[in-house]
Amino acid sequence: MSCSPNFCKVSFLVSNVFPVLKSPVIGTRTNIFLLVVYSSLVSSLVGMRSFPLYPSGLTSRTSHSFSILLIFFFVTVFIVLMGIYLRIPDIRATVVANTFVLNMSRFII
C-alpha cells in the first residue's frame, strides 16, 4: 500500500515516538522533553520545505542533504541544552533522542 510522503513521515514518527513515551523507564519530565524535541524537529522539516537553507552553487541533492544535516546539528544542540536545563538524571533519554534523530535522518535522506 502506497502513501503520500507527508503521511508516511507522520506515521513513521508516531510509530517510533509513542512506544518510547509509554516506556516506564523514562520519567514524565523526559517524556515532555522528547515531545518538545520532536515538535521542533517536525517544524524544522516543514520550515525547510518552505524556506530552503541552500548555500548558492550546490546541486539540489547536495543542498538538500546539507540542509538536513544543519537542522539535525541544531536539534542535537537543542537536545543537549534541554537535557542540562531539565537536569535529566541519566543519559538514557539523550541516547534515545539521538537514536531517533539518526533514524529520522536515514528515513528522510
UniProtKB/Swiss-Prot annotation:
Membrane topology: Multi-pass membrane protein
Entry GO CC: membrane
Membrane-spanning ranges: 32-52, 66-86
Keywords, comma-separated and alphabetical: Membrane, Transmembrane, Transmembrane helix
Cell compartments where the protein resides: Membrane
More about this protein: Partially overlaps CBS1.
Protein name: Putative uncharacterized protein YDL068W
